């Protein structure tokens, strides 16, 4: 699954917002997204994806939430 799909899945499954570091940790722990080089997903990558999709995500009180 793509990184944006993995982020949406985690936030929707949890039912509440998550911090960026929590999202990155869960993506890696659950192996929801694999980088082409085999390295773990970084919190910088997660943050960059979130910032590229303002129509999907909002940052409130240090947590990332879905706009839906």
Which residues make up each language-model segment?
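Short helix-capping/hinge SLiMs at alpha-helix to coil transitions
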Residues: 12-16
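Charged low-complexity interaction tracts in eukaryotic proteins
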Residues: 1-4, 18-21, 26-68
């Amino acid at each position: 699954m793509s990184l944006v799909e993995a982020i949406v899945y985690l936030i929707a499954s949890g039912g509440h917002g998550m911090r960026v570091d929590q999202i990155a940790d869960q993506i890696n722990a659950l192996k929801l997204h694999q980088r082409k080089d085999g390295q773990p997903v970084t919190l910088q990558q997660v943050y960059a994806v979130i910032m590229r999709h303002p129509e999907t995500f909002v940052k409130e009180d240090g947590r990332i939430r879905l706009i839906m």
